[in-house]
Amino acid sequence: MTDYSSKEYLAKVDAFWRAANYISVGQLYLKDNPLLQRPLEAKDVKVKPIGHWGTISGQNFLYAHLNRAINKYDLNMFYVEGPGHGGQVMVSNSYLDGSYTEIYPEISQDVDGMKKLFKQFSFPGGVASHAAPETPGSIHEGGELGYSLSHGVGAILDNPDVIAAVVVGDGEAETGPLAASWLSSTFINPKNDGAVLPILNLNGFKISNPTILSRKSDEELTKYFEGNGWAPIFVEGDDPEKMHPATAAAMDEAIEKIQAIQKAARENGDTSRPVWPMIVFRAPKGWTGPKTWDGVPIENSFRAHQIPVPIDSTDMQHADALVDWMKSYRPEELFTAEGQLKPEIAAMAPKGDKRMAANPITNGGIDPKPLRLPDYRDYAVDNTEHGKVVAQDMIVLGEYVRDIIKDNDQNKNFRIFGPDETMSNRLNHIFDVTNRQWMEPIKEPNDQFMATEGRVLDSQLSEHQAEGWLEGYVLTGRHGFFASYESFLRVVDSMLTQHFKWLRKADEQAWRNKYPSLNVIATSTVFQQDHNGYTHQDPGVLTHLAEKKPEFIREYLPADANTLLATMNTVFQSQEKINLVIASKHPRQQWFSIDEATVLVKNGLKIIDWASTDQDAEPDVVIAAAGTEPTLESLAAISILHKQYPDMKIRFINVVDLLKLRSPKVDPRGLTDEEFDMYFTKDKPVVFAFHGFEGLVRDIFFDRHNHNLHVHGYRENGDITTPFDMRVLNQMDRYNLSKEVAIDVLGDQAGQFAQSMDDMVAKHNQYIRDEGTDLPEVEEWQWTPLR
């Protein structure tokens, strides 16, 4: 029986660590002569070594010990690399365990393959200095710091047999998102979920500053982490001979505590919130590298952060220092002359899927299943009479989502995430069948819908956490959505960017399996935030995402409940997209039949016959609308215009899939010029009522024939005011739209009508200041058929 704590076994762990360190340094500097089997020459060294050293050795040490723990306890474990610029760690270790070569056969486990491995790192046409999608075993690149623990938690939800070993950088730990993510202990259910083992890598320094937590005493850190629901286990030192047994003991203690917690929950029915173990690992930044340079410390200093020895192919003055450093790992003990890891060391790596780099969870998930969807048509609102029914789109969606939860109860592969906004965003019906997952004490009747098990995670007021959990969940093959206030999606728009970048690069890797899409619902929108005011009014996430590569971005603006149902049916079946859905939560008139809604979503837009008077002829004007309030105001404007100018030929177009309007030169899905002209004509005025910033629509029309465009969107005007006044403030109301159309079509002949519209706006302004509510003409307006 193997003694995993014996000196002999730990000596092999040390050898594996040294091999990983050697491979990691080689990737920084060399492009040839990988085993230094001849004197180092300028041609062997990169012109410009790029990369980072400071975090590498400590992480390689942890990786080797996690391998030991996997072997000892037969664990299902994967690795999340939180510290920035640690790209060599997962590359080096996957190369040593063989998984890298299985994916990239040209990077063979011999001298020639090692040469290619070294050269490609941070090299044109090569691989990144992060744990990018090209890296086996990675679900987290770690370019933008702060999300490692959120991703790890998202991954282990509903994966009860999995442990996420999340190494948290001590610089990363200073970010807001990471600091918030320690509260994740409140949400991990040990019965149904896996476990996260956070390992705080306290190497002491960032780019040029000390790290805050590294200067705290063990007592202070213990209080901090215990208050967040974690029991820290400390390991500290710089002597490998002492650090190996200490780290092995710490790992054993942590794993056995996790297993005891899970056993108590699964076999004994313990529903209390556990105190999960974590490891605080204090080892020097740049450990095992050069101690000093030019009389100042390198190891255990910020100076170890990047390239510690100044050597490149044009300056070989200090080549001996690099050679001495690399040979300090005694490569002749680690590799054969042919460049293969010696068998007794290679045997230390876990086998098959037990290798962290080959764990299926990191490549699209463990046995991923498609979402079972009920027929969205069964939840449709009867809109036989357009605008007669008043409903709340998100309430209706909640009925559909409620049944998605029921239909997927057995698979446990669907969750809803949010920052304390699920009820505010009117997803009330989901609580007919589930609860909020919450492991803290529950105090009824003061609390509502709280339980130790539930499909909703919305009880932490952190957009970063909700987004990070969802990312971890979908990157491991499951499904869900994140619903939040539209303006506060800007809090996580950089996270959305990072997820997009992951999707794009992962899609280029033939070996990467597909991911379910990341679905984001923006509600409590800019034109519905009259009660919360200017701070809550920002539709800019539309513009932000539209700037990304179009293959991975979808933006939907359903105008009513039926269109929202058809939209969500589409996005839940999609893969490798970021789907942004702008949805209304307030009572609104309902417009489209479920068949119309289906066509709207399928085609992206539709000429609405019942709201048009062009009778398939060339119109005098095109009125287009994208969004709930833009659609309402456009229809009201059409009513006003038709009453005043019954002979005016108006074409009304509703737009749901906004980016489909773009030219095929920009977006492969875009309408051809012929199709676009069929909708919008080549030269007739287009008055476009838009939910977002106007520049996005102008950009869409730039490559088209028709530049006779007049956009009425959000003009950065807002306040605490009435609902209709929000539209008036931005001239996206029925009166300003009607005035625009009349002037565009009739010119000076529309002067009297334009004045009447200005008079209505003036009347509105006075009325709301007198009465505090909108005009009866607005509040009581109903659609009447045009013919």
UniProtKB/Swiss-Prot annotation:
Its EC number is 4.1.2.-. InterPro entries: Phosphoketolase, THDP-binding, Transketo_C/PFOR_II, Xul5P/Fru6P_PKetolase, Xul5P/Fru6P_PKetolase_C, Xul5P/Fru6P_PKetolase_CS, Xul5P/Fru6P_PKetolase_N, Xul5P/Fru6P_PKetolase_ThDP_BS. Keywords: Lyase, Thiamine pyrophosphate. Its cofactor is thiamine diphosphate. GO terms for biological process: carbohydrate metabolic process. It comes from the Bacteria. GO terms for molecular function: aldehyde-lyase activity. Signal peptide: none annotated. Belongs to the XFP family. PANTHER family: PHOSPHOKETOLASE-RELATED. NCBIfam families: PRK05261.1-3, PRK05261.1-4. This is Probable phosphoketolase. The lineage of its organism: Bacteria, Bacillati, Bacillota, Bacilli, Lactobacillales.
